[in-house]
Every structure is written in C-alpha cells, then in structure tokens.
From Swiss-Prot:
It comes from the Eukaryota. The keyword Plastid applies. Fe cation binds at residues 266, 319, 398, 612. The keyword Hydrolase does not apply. It comes from Arabidopsis thaliana. Keywords: Chloroplast, Dioxygenase, Iron, Metal-binding, Oxidoreductase, Plastid, Transit peptide. InterPro entries: Carotenoid_Oase. This is Carotenoid cleavage dioxygenase 7, chloroplastic.
C-alpha cells in the first residue's frame, strides 16, 4: 500500500531566514532520478559509470565505511592545520563511538550497525592548548571470538541483527545478538561505558581506552532502589501474551543467547536533579504485540534510586526517547512480524531483522506520555496507556530535547524536538545501503529522487497541550524552524536537557552535490528557536560531517549563556583520506570566522564514520 507523504513535511510556503558563512553553488536542475550505479568489482552486481562525478560519488560514499584495523598504543599528538585551540577552551575529552571493522578476511561484510565498536578519544588540554588522539577496539566477547591476535586476522562468526555472512555459517547460526558496543558512549560517576542497542554496556578505562569488561547498569546499586510508586504496573493478571512471553524466553535466552532485557543505547541526563536516566525493554518484546519498558534513574554516584515499569499493548521498536521534568516520552515506532522475512532470516538468506517489518496501518503516530513520579504529577489522573496521537505518520530516529511548561489555567504544554522520517522510506535491511552480496553500500538508498526527499530524516517540532484533566486539546507537528533539508543528530547544550532551550544544533545536507544530495551530511546547522533563525557552517567539497557536539565554556552556576561554547565535529575529508576534528565557535556559526581550529588525525589512523559521541570535562 502506498502511503501519502505526511503533509507537515511539505516545504513551508515561506522559508526561514538563513545565514551562511558562504554561499553554496546553485542546485542542479531537477533530474528524473538519482542513480548511482555500482562499478564492476567482481564481487556482485555490476553497473555502468555514467560520468566521473558519479564514480567519485560512489567511491566517496564507500570511503566513509572503510575498516580501520589499527589501534593506538599511546596517545598521538594531533596538531592544528588551521587556527589554534582557543585559550578559553575547557580541558576534557571528546569520545566518539562507532564501528571500526566491516569486512573480515573470509569474504563477509557486515552492516555498519554490526561493525565492531571502535572508540575514538580526542583529549584537549585547555591550559597547554594541546590535543591528543587515542583509538582502540572495545574488547567485547564477540571481538575476542572473531579476532585472532596472533595472526591479526578476523573471521565473522556472529550474524548480528542486520547482516548476512557471505563467508560464514548462515543456516542455523543462532549467534544473532552480536554486542559490538558501537553505538554511544556514557561517562557517569567516573565510569566510561560503551553502549549497544541490545546488550549490556562495556566499561572502558578512560585514559588508556582498555576494556574493563561488561557492566550491568540496571542492577548497579540496586539495594538502594526506592520505587516510590507502583501505579505504573499492570496487575490485571496473566493473559495470552504473558503466556507467549513465558514460552519465548527460554528460546531467546537459551538458544539465541539474548539477555533478558534489551538495554537502549540512548540515555538521558537530568541536570537539575543530577540524575542519569536509562531504559530497557524485554527481549521477547521484539516478537510480541506488547512492549515492556523499565526506566531507571541513578544518582551522581551511580546508585539506582528509582525504577518505573510500563506495559504497553503495542508492538514497538524504540531507539531513542525523551524526558521532561515529570514525564518520560516514547514515540511508538510501530512494527509487526513478517512471516516471509522470518523464514528467510532463519535460513540465513536475509538478516534476522527482516523478521520484522514496519506497521503503517495507522495514519497517525502514537506518543506515550509516561509519569516519572507518583500520580500527583499526572494530569488529572490521566491514563498513560492512552497515547496522544499526532496526525502525521512519523518514524522517530533521534530526540534532541523535550520540555514542559504549566500555564496559569492549569494546561500542561509539552514540546518535543527530534529527527523523524517517513514509514515509506525507513527500511531495517537497507539502512546505509547495505548489500551483503556485493560487499558494497548503495548510496542511492540514502539519496532519493527529487521530490521524495521529504521522506528522509528531517527535524520536527511536536507541540501538545493537555488540560487539567489530562485530555489532549491539541497535538501538532511542523518542521523545526521551517527547515526542510534532510537532517539528523539533533543536539543541545546538555545543561538545558529536559527544560526550555533556545538553541539546537544538527548535521544536515546542503544539497549542493548532485550525486549525493541528501547523505552523507556536509553541514552543521544552528537553530534559534526563539527568533526562528537558521545558521549554517558547511564543509568543503567531498568532505562530510557526523554528529556535532556542544562543549560549554563554563558551567551553568558560572552564568553560562546557552550558546556560550564550542561545537566539535569530525570532518571526514574523503578526497584526501583524512579525518579532522573541527572546533567551531557556537556563537559565530553562519559567519566567515566560525572555524576556530581544525586538528588533523594522522593518515594511518583515518577512521570510518562514527555514530554518537560525548564531551566529558576533566
């Protein structure tokens, strides 16, 4: 069934004012289609290169996902090739998680989401104005099994949820949950953790980046847990889905070695309360039309002080979420079982994730507003099991921020800022253009024909109003600041998490490269949410960026302004096979002197695109 394009994603009639530090070249005339053919490599399907620009676009895209097998033994000094580290730059470390290895020595290529975790650390000494770079693989159980340290060779044995092994065991391979610790990184109470969507985090020694071992976040300090309210639990009794869950648990945990709970790689920090917020869901939730979520809150010493459990009668796939002062917020990315895909997955002919497909049966998107504390904080005793419905069909990818304000008349207003895409575009198997048969990535999956780009990830603002009795008076979605270019990785000054923010930053595509108009991203965007202004900083030709990260100059207690700081972002200069750490003055984005410094990583340590990062002050 062909679904309509969500009307809120259509380009605004009047574009917001945009300030660039340079004027991009005009867009090429509309093309009938964007077709990036895969060259004849002898590894899979073939195609015809129409011109050099198409060929270079294909090569550039592959270059972002080239394995880096080298690790640093000692921190490597990196020097600026442009500008210098500013005198007021705080001392600390920018950690970046992501995959490092995609291809083994036996013919298999894995999906980027299944690539072994490769932690990168840029330490900046603000006093000496010097920087060092360190990079090491997270020594997970999967890495120990698949890597031979004597011969320094790799053989993939774990399938992973998103991959098919071309040179390994396919049929009957139950090694699905391949914890590669490659998604995000957390530092809390002196502990550095690498996270993955589906298993326990791995603890890392923050100086050397040596792996300490697995770390059970949920049970840490459990003896001090004080669950202040049990009204969130469904005590209605055992039903058919509970019975199904009981039957699935020994299969998933015994045969497929899945942990009982799937730890989400996205966490939140409540700066006002100085709490770490995490969420897990049950392993069997992937196969049942019911979802169980456990939210945990930890104090500054990593002691578990509160848990809240919610059972929701919907089949959902959650990657990111949001919180406000008194609520947790979940976008219901709805999925369903795919019988045909399940058979293909069990036979090893498609990734295990093909057992699921998106469920676009509803034209609206449910949003669950879950109480963080006791009922006195709920809106008129509102039943949290009833979601708020937003009229557009959104698949939420990443949450930037959410906050709530209480009006004099008793209304509660909630705003959510996030990146979201259409159900018509999102595809578990084809993310990043993964093709296990050709051992190449197809850029056209991420770069749609003109007109279809509205289906790609964009930044949106969801605004809702609940009255004093908990009824939803309104729920609207619109492009953030009217911005309609493909964008993702929304971030803010973390001191403003969970409360009203004025600024947001993200990675985006300028659309100036005709062969790769939508992805990879080549811009950092700054949104002024009060004035509705948009300012951008763009890379040079054949250079791309990942997730930006805000680095504050001072703490909130010292009178910090929200944008008083810097943006650090990795620039992937594929044309010269180099990576750079770029430091931008957050206040000057959109001006010609936004770049404060560009630090060069040695060529032999050039690394593939990372996922999510963290700034940790010394």
């Amino acid at each position: 069934m062909s679904l309509p394009i969500p009307p809120k994603f259509l380009p605004p009639l009047k574009s917001p004012p945009i300030h660039h530090h340079q004027t991009p070249p005009p867009l090429a005339p509309p093309r009938a289609a964007i077709s990036i053919s895969i060259p004849d490599t002898g590894l899979g399907r073939t195609g015809t290169i129409l011109d050099e620009s198409t060929s270079s676009a294909f090569r550039d895209y592959q270059s972002l996902f080239v394995s880096q097998r080298s690790e640093t033994i000692e921190p490597v000094v990196i020097k600026p090739i442009e500008g210098s580290i500013p005198v007021n730059f705080p001392s600390g470390t920018y950690y970046l998680a992501g995959p490092g290895l995609f291809t083994d020595d036996h013919g298999s290529t894995v999906h980027p989401l299944d690539g072994h975790g490769y932690l990168r650390a840029f330490h900046i000494d603000g006093n000496k104005r010097k920087a060092t770079f360190t990079a090491k693989y997270v020594k997970t159980e999967a890495k120990k099994e698949e890597h031979d340290p004597v011969t320094d060779t790799w053989r993939f044995t774990h399938r992973g949820p998103f991959s098919v092994l071309k040179g390994g065991k396919r049929f009957g391979n139950t090694k699905v949950m391949k914890n590669v610790a490659n998604t995000s990184v957390l530092k809390w109470a002196g502990r550095l953790l690498c996270l993955w969507e589906g298993g326990e985090p791995y603890e890392i020694e923050s100086g050397s980046l040596d792996t300490v071992g697995r770390f059970n976040v949920e049970n840490n300090g459990c003896e001090s847990c004080d669950d202040d309210d049990s009204s969130d639990r469904d005590l209605s009794g055992h039903d058919i889905w509970d019975t199904a869950a009981d039957l699935l648990k020994p299969i998933l945990q015994g045969v497929f070695k899945m942990p009982p709970k799937r730890f989400l790689s996205h966490y939140k920090v409540d700066g006002r309360r100085k709490r770490l917020l995490t969420v897990t869901c049950n392993a069997e939730d992937m196969l049942l039309p019911r979802s169980n979520f456990t939210f945990c809150e930890y104090d500054s010493e990593f002691k578990l002080i509160q848990t809240k459990e919610f059972k929701i009668d919907d089949h959902m796939m959650i990657h990111d979420w949001a919180f406000t002062d008194t609520h947790y917020i979940l976008f219901a990315n709805r999925v369903k079982l795919n019988p045909i895909g399940s058979i293909a997955a069990m036979c090893g002919m498609s990734p295990m994730v093909s057992a699921l497909s998106l469920n676009p049966s509803n034209e609206s998107s449910p949003i669950y507003i879950l109480p963080r504390f006791s009922d006195k904080y709920s809106r008129g005793g509102r039943d949290w099991r009833v979601p708020v419905e937003v009229s557009s069909q959104l698949w939420l990818i990443h949450s930037g921020n959410a906050y709530e304000t209480r009006e004099d008349n008793g209304d509660l207003k909630i705003q959510i800022q996030a990146s979201a895409c259409s159900y018509r575009w999102f595809d578990f198997q084809k993310m990043f253009g993964y093709d296990w048969q050709s051992n190449k990535l197809d850029p056209s999956v991420m770069n749609l024909n003109r007109g279809d780009d509205k289906l790609l990830p964009h930044l949106v603002k969801v605004s809702m109003t609940l009255d004093s009795t908990g009824n939803c008076n309104s729920c609207d979605v619109e492009p953030l600041n009217g911005w309609n270019k493909p964008s993702d990785f929304p971030v803010i000054n973390s001191s403003w998490s969970g409360k009203k923010n004025k600024y947001m930053y993200s990675a985006a595509s300028s659309g100036t490269r005709s062969e790769l108009p939508h992805f990879p991203f080549d811009m950092v965007v700054k949104f002024d949410l009060d004035s509705n202004l948009v300012r951008t900083w763009s890379t040079g030709a054949r250079r791309f960026v990942g997730e930006p990260m805000f680095v504050p100059k001072n703490s909130v207690e010292e009178g910090e302004e929200e944008d008083d700081g810097y943006i650090v972002v990795v620039e992937y200069a594929v044309s010269v096979e180099r990576c750079y750490l770029v430091i931008l003055d957050a206040k000057k984005i959109g001006e010609s002197d936004a770049v404060v410094s560009r630090l060069e990583v040695p060529r032999n340590l050039t690394f593939p695109m990372g996922f999510h990062g963290l700034w940790a002050s010394d």
